[in-house]
Amino acid sequence: MSNMLKFGIPKGSLENATVELFKKSGWQVSISSRSYFPGIDDSEMTCKLIRPQEMGRYVERATIDAGIAGRDWVSENQSDVVEVCEMVYSKVSRRPARWVLVANGDSNVKGPEDLAGATIATELVGFTKRYFSERNIPVNVEFSWGATEAKVVDGLCDAIVEVTETGSTIKANGLRIVCELMESVPVLIANKASWADPWKREKIEQIATLLKSSLAAENMVGLKMNAPGDKVEAITSVLPSLKNATVSHLYNSDWLSIESVMSEKEVRRVIPELIKLGAEGIIEYPLNKII
């Protein structure tokens, strides 16, 4: 196989977040509104914009070597691909999306078994059919082209299976979550033949490592300071860190340099304590990656 990796960027709600994640990871991806072929500053890669709903199929067929899609759509299509890693990010938050069974707020539905013989509207038809079939609950599942919440409000169906992060839109429409059917996060998937190719596998693993390290660094900062030798133990005891703080001697001095990594929101608590304990020259700096 040639040393060129064909990669799928998810088009739609994940598009901007994915491009930004690649940027933080060291790749510049440029997307034109009139093209489905983004540019990327990597001579070993080409990119295509593909709907997440179709990504698994194209990866399975080797139209592309690898791509990013929601685990929900990989499951929906039952795509025979390699799941390289999962990455928790979305267009609005850093939490997983949930596919939930939803009914009217005033309905008597308490669980899936109460919907025997009912009509359910959803975009995730295949998964929903399998879910109810595995539980021997007969239902009629209809594909929804959108505005799915309105269908159950208007009485066009008895319940819906819809994706949500916060549940706020569901509540705003007077609906109620009956139960969660599946949790989904973006996953990096690879074609099996591409994964078996040593060069392509190494390239895909490189991408996975850097994307995950950028996500791990979000909302984390580094803190560096100088401290007198007799205060080091007290100072390091108040420092949260991924591992023990790094301590090194300053040249020609009995002072030491201390460095630590922590959550950004912890800094406001830690810095005043450090000052009280005698730390000086405190520097906070952003992190791009944590590996």
Swiss-Prot record:
Q: Which GO terms describe its molecular function?
A: ATP binding; ATP phosphoribosyltransferase activity; magnesium ion binding
Against InterPro entries, the record matches this protein to:
ATP-PRT_HisG_long (IPR020621), ATP_PRibTrfase_cat (IPR013820), ATP_PRibTrfase_HisG (IPR001348), HisG_C (IPR013115), N-reg_PII-like_a/b (IPR011322), N-reg_PII/ATP_PRibTrfase_C (IPR015867)
Top-level taxon in the UniProt lineage? Bacteria
Compartments annotated for it: namely:
Cytoplasm
Q: Which Pfam families match?
A: HisG (PF01634), HisG_C (PF08029)
Enzyme Commission number(s) from the entry: 2.4.2.17
Q: What catalytic activity does the UniProt entry give for this protein?
A: 1-(5-phospho-beta-D-ribosyl)-ATP + diphosphate = 5-phospho-alpha-D-ribose 1-diphosphate + ATP
Q: What activity regulation does UniProt give?
A: Feedback inhibited by histidine.
Report the cofactors: Mg(2+)
Q: Name one GO biological process term.
A: L-histidine biosynthetic process
Q: Read off the SUPFAM superfamilies from this record.
A: GlnB-like (SSF54913), Periplasmic binding protein-like II (SSF53850)
Look up the record and name the pathway of this protein: Amino-acid biosynthesis; L-histidine biosynthesis; L-histidine from 5-phospho-alpha-D-ribose 1-diphosphate: step 1/9
One GO CC term, this protein: cytoplasm
Name of the top EC class for this enzyme: transferase
Could you tell me the keywords of this UniProt record? Answer: Amino-acid biosynthesis, ATP-binding, Cytoplasm, Glycosyltransferase, Histidine biosynthesis, Magnesium, Metal-binding, Nucleotide-binding, Transferase
The transmembrane residues are none
PANTHER family associated with the record: ATP PHOSPHORIBOSYLTRANSFERASE, ATP PHOSPHORIBOSYLTRANSFERASE ATP-PRTASE
Family recorded in the similarity comment:
Belongs to the ATP phosphoribosyltransferase family. Long subfamily.
- Which protein is depicted? ATP phosphoribosyltransferase
Q: Which organism is it from?
A: Pelobacter propionicus (strain DSM 2379 / NBRC 103807 / OttBd1)
